[in-house]
Design a protein with these regions (language model features):
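A short, conserved alpha-helix in the catalytic core of glycosyltransferases
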Residues: 181, 222-234, 239-271
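Short aromatic/hydrophobic "clamp" motif used to bind/position activated sugar donors
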Residues: 165
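A conserved acidic beta->alpha catalytic loop
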Residues: 120-129, 172
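A recurrent flexible, glycine/aromatic-enriched loop bordering the glycosyltransferase active site
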Residues: 150, 207-228, 241-243, 285
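Short, acidic, metal-binding catalytic loop of nucleotide-sugar glycosyltransferases
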Residues: 104-113
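Conserved donor NDP-sugar-binding/catalytic core segment of glycosyltransferases
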Residues: 173-208
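Glycine-rich, basic loop-to-helix element that forms the pyrophosphate-binding segment
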Residues: 143-160, 209
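C-terminal, non-catalytic tails of nucleotide-sugar-dependent glycosyltransferases
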Residues: 66-86, 192-196, 200-202, 224, ...
Length: 314
């Protein structure tokens, strides 16, 4: 396999950083590291030496199929005017039957002006084989490797054309029109995020089921928001590779109007849908999913732990 050529400017920055580290100028070293990462590379220190590696897998073209190495490599529609009422985003990884069940429910009850984006995030061979083929209402976007939940959501958002984006987990089976009630909720400018399942917390530390009505956050089973807000407030933090608690973080980002200003609302709206087994949870051993959940929750506390104005019903 051919090695990826390191650009001259990146290599020069790496040597400058090595000199800064030798001089114990840690601030300069950190600043240069950020420049290297912004250029799409990561630096690994090896004593006084270093190694440079691409920050993301490469984007690969196989005939007419493109597999993207990062969310940022996916062409974005966010600068274009919205077209249509909503875009539903589904992330496909390892469970083709779950994706097909969710798609069947959407197809049976699709509303005019609704498009669908399936993000095949490093799909298993079985999932890759079962991805929807030529369908004018469904776009499939593939990644080279498993990028993680936040990156997959970013991919779907970048390809969304509808004025509202609905991220629908494949464990959810629509039994009716799940789009219209959420679009209607977001017609209220005081609402920043809406969905079928909400949770509440008095302190942003412990959450319990809440709704219908005003809640603290919307769960990622069905979470809807304005495409324009995603463009203005995104992208999502891609350190959230595991799905758990990303929905809380994104809900708070969408609600936050800044300290001293009343936050926007999160509203749970009844939708005609059935929740099935969430395989992203049950497929992992309990210690591993608890570890990953805690890591994600610390990111919420780091950013919003002091924001008691965001606690309680939004």
């Amino acid at each position: 396999m051919a090695r990826t050529r390191i650009p001259d400017d990146v290599l020069s920055l790496a040597h400058d950083r090595a000199k800064a580290r030798a001089a114990r100028d840690w601030a300069a070293a950190d600043r240069i590291r950020a420049q290297i990462e912004d250029a799409g590379w990561k630096i690994v220190d090896r004593g006084t030496d270093f190694a440079l590696e691409p920050a993301h897998p490469p984007t690969v073209t196989e005939g007419e199929i493109v597999r993207y190495g990062s969310s940022g490599a996916v062409p974005s529609r966010l600068a274009e005017p919205a077209a249509g009422v909503a875009t539903v985003v589904l992330v496909a990884t390892d469970w083709p039957a779950d994706l097909e069940r969710a798609l069947a429910g959407l197809r049976a009850h699709v509303t005019e002006g609704t498009s669908i984006v399936v993000v095949a995030d490093g799909p298993s061979p079985a999932q890759d084989e079962a991805l929807p083929g030529d369908d004018p209402g469904i776009e499939v976007v593939r990644t080279t490797e498993r990028l993680g939940t936040a990156a997959a959501w970013n991919v779907g958002i970048r390809r969304a054309s509808g004025a509202v984006v609905l991220i629908l987990d494949t464990s959810v089976e629509p039994a009716g029109d799940v789009v219209t009630p959420l679009v209607a909720a977001l017609a209220d400018p005081t609402v920043g995020v809406a969905g079928g399942f909400g949770i509440v917390s008095p302190d942003l530390r412990a959450f319990v089921d809440g709704g219908p009505g005003d809640v603290t956050a919307i769960e990622g089973y069905a979470i809807a928001f304005r495409r324009s807000d995603a463009a203005a407030r995104g992208p999502l933090d891609e350190r959230f590779r595991f799905y758990r608690n990303l929905d809380i973080w994104w809900s708070l980002v969408l609600r936050d109007e800044g300290e001293g200003s009343p936050p926007r609302r999160a509203v749970a709206v009844p939708i005609p849908a059935t929740r099935h087994e969430h395989r992203g949870w049950t497929a992992l051993p309990e210690p591993e999913r608890d570890r990953l959940s805690k890591r994600n929750f610390y990111r919420i506390i780091d950013r919003f732990g002091h924001r008691r104005d965001l606690a309680g019903p939004g």
